[in-house]
Amino acid sequence: IILEFLFFWDAHVLFMMEKWKSRAGDRARGWFSDLGEWEALCSLAKLAADEPEWVFPKVNSVDDNTAAIVKGTSVGHPLLNEDRVANDVQLGPPGTVLLVTGSNMSGKSTLLRSVGVNIVLAQMGSVVCAKSFSLPPLHIETSMRIADSLADGVSFFMAELKRLKAIVDTAKKHDANNPKRMLFLLDEILQGTNSRERQIAVSRVVRKLIDGNAIGAISTHDLDLATTDDLAVACQTVHFAEQFEDVDGVRTMTFDYQMRQGIAETTNALKLLEMVGLGEEDDD
């Protein structure tokens, strides 16, 4: 306060700052950008140091169409602990889609998230949660956890349709000559309609994505989707399953979260109803 009163200190500081700004201010934005990039790289280096068993991915050539495949060995979700269950995953080649079926809570959505998060890490230059991982340069589009909007008057189903339309439009822009392949991850889409129309709609959406030279995966409870005329040839089917066992006379359900080939052969919705007390024997 005394310096300000005697020497107008604030005015001197302002004058010096304006002088510095005119001399070096144009370069300051670049300095802060470089500092931010350095901080991000330090974070990636810290992740590599904290997870010595993770690996750096291999990036395939964009000129090789046969290399337009995402392939990982023992891929796990980076945010889960050491008890995570890893699976071997392959998305592609173009013209195919990975169709993931399985009962509730079996691991379908977690698989898609594991693939997506590891791809993001890979394209940042980070290590990934896998024993091996290869991919081409990718542009990722997802449909997960869609939300409706009362304020905008948009229902859940309409919000999902708009999101899918945006994904399809992006796929059309990413033709074979684009430097980045488009990858889509669709988690149990179009649940807000009846099964017959859902099969038709999902088949149409996936066909448009495949025709756009995109690669990707879709999870679903619809076991008949893989047999539809549009997708029967294109689908690579995998599934997750549950196991039931009696523990002290109580019927319990467990999951091993291991991905298996083919379409799911079991469902568990009615069994879950019984387990929470909503079975037929609980009507009274």
Task: Write out the residue ranges for each language-model feature.
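ATPase nucleotide-binding head domains, primarily ABC-like/P-loop NTPase cores
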Residues: 44, 51-284
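A conserved P-loop NTPase coupling/switch region
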Residues: 1-35, 41, 47, 65
